[in-house]
């Protein structure tokens, strides 16, 4: 295998130049992991065996689930275990955002498909912090370094990642074509009209 961190001189220099030199041991360990033959194989498998929709079970009942190859879950689990999704917020200190960005790059450059939920989770934290209720409910799960691939609602999970639903059938990837609306119903309730894919 290859140490994807230590052999990347510009990344090593940037980590030190911008105050995150303290993170070099963690970044080196992650660099060795993502450069290993087994991680590279998982990246290959995750992109060869793409997600598939499971709309209905064998009796015809709606599922609306997405099935992923186990390799994808191993990659996502490793990124979460290394804090690529929230370490800068969970353990704030000088250079923490630089260290997290470097960690994110190490994982995303090998398998970019998992980068979306990892980066969205990182980006969602400041918005969640604006609400004491939401922060109290979600941040402990987001700051967790564990990853559970089982489909369950938030009450049955000790960790969480954040995603977004922007695509609508009439718009495809054109977000401007969205027609879904939300009307505040009081308290923490909204009435949503439309649907997302």
Predicted segments with their positions:
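Glycine-rich flavin
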Residues: 68-197
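Extended, charge-enriched "interface" segments that sit outside catalytic cores
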Residues: 1-93, 112
